Amino acid sequence: MTASEQTALLGSPRKPAYTIFSNSQKLLIILTATLASVFSPLSANIYYPALKSIQKELNVSEEILNMTITSYMIFQGLSPTFIGSLSDTIGRRPVYIICFLIYIAANVGLTFQTTFIGLLLLRCLQSSGSSSTVNLAYGVTADVVTSAERGRYVGLASVGPIIGPTLGPVLGGIISQYYGWRFIFVVLTGMALIMLIFIIVFLPETCRNIVGNGSLEPLSVWNKPLSSFLCKKKENEDLDETLEAQQAIEAARKKGGKPKPWKSLTLLFTYPTGCVILFNGFTFATYYAVTTSLTWCFSSTYHFNEVEIGLSYIPIGVGSMIAAFTNGFLLDWNYRRAVKKVLGRPLARGEHFDHDTGVALGFHIERTRLQIVIPAVVLAMLAMVAYGWSVYLVLTPAVPLVLLFLFGWLGTAAYSGMNVLIVDLNLKSPATATAANNLIRCMLGALGAMVIMPIINAVGMGWTFIMISGVWIVLSPLIILVAWSKSSE
């Protein structure tokens, strides 16, 4: 962790607050970022129930139409690679505005297009606009919260990408059935307009390269919420920064420099971040393989109709949402326990702990986070294998549905825990690091979605998920090495 998160050690001078935002302000900021991050996965999944209708109207084959899904995921991985670095340089607000303007324009075009080529290109544009909102949410979270509270707040930020796949198929099916598939994009346009207006009016700039801990006035009008022009900013009487601290923040602002989109790619080859990103990407790919195969498996094995299949996504979605909330508190509890062990006292509320100082005392952020992640991975693996065999043996539907709930809970706990660690390891450029994570996540997820059904058709559900577990085990030394080697921050 960088020196921006300082610990109030005995006898040390008073340090500036990590952020001037109150707890309620931080919660509102992160909730806004979370809602914005819903659009990328929602746009991907709301589209699925309408595929048959679109295929009939555009008169294309299923294989050709599936190109719109593959291309969406490719741009979902590539776009944040460039946008993440841009947001670390020019700020979160301008990038949010750019992304939503692109997204709204794409949805308007999708509403009126009449050709497959138009659909394909506009889906790529739609993905480019919405996909960066996910890593922006993690970037905003890292801007305003410290490591001691990052677990629960990053858990909250991860709710958006979880809600989208859960609600998308249900909402898309209802809209497509009663209003036609084009109205899906009308609804998305309206939702995006409301979100954009809220961001323009209320969301403050949080990027630490622009506003430091929030106390600096942004230089650009695009970094200022409209509300700041309507009411005078309240002075923070508790803020007593020294001249040295203020100069450090100003220097951080000037160091923003030019965007470096290639930095996301270099992180993939950086230890330990690269190891965590690769293992995390496969964890997500496994999750995506399970959800992608769910429709076919339940329709062929249990003869579920479209409504029943849509409802079958609810258990894994609910499990994922529970993990997003509960795992954050567990991560924070374990963090405070580890810090107390090396300091000999508990962290005071709002106290910031310097990880660089902690290393000399025997504290390792990688090990602290992965102590929660590794057990979750093992249990998720067992739940996934049990789910595969329960469907293969045609047990009562309640059994695989319960196992889907457990897999959603445990898999998301592992995934979100590694997301927190990736942010911890890259506090100077959290959005860039999350973009690298997103790139691998989407590419491996697309690969998992592409190969899962051919493998199931070849060897069956049970053996398919045993094979996936085998790959998971082969990759496990990556994460074990990070957890029990010397800290490399």
From Swiss-Prot:
Protein name, UniProt field: MFS-type transporter phiL
Membrane topology classification: Multi-pass membrane protein
Keyword set, alphabetical order: Glycoprotein, Membrane, Transmembrane, Transmembrane helix, Transport
Gene Ontology molecular function, alphabetical: transmembrane transporter activity
Xref: Pfam families: MFS_1 (PF07690)
Organism: Talaromyces stipitatus (strain ATCC 10500 / CBS 375.48 / QM 6759 / NRRL 1006) (Penicillium stipitatum)
Function (record text): MFS-type transporter; part of the gene cluster that mediates the biosynthesis of the antihypercholesterolemic agents phomoidrides which are dimeric anhydrides.
Subcellular location: Membrane
GO annotation, cellular component aspect: plasma membrane
Segments traversing the membrane: 27-47, 64-84, 97-117, 155-175, 183-203, 265-285, 311-331, 370-390, 391-411, 442-462, 463-483
Similarity section: Belongs to the major facilitator superfamily. CAR1 family.
Residues glycosylated per entry: 59, 213
Classification via InterPro entries: MFS, MFS_dom, MFS_trans_sf
Top-level taxon in the UniProt lineage: Eukaryota
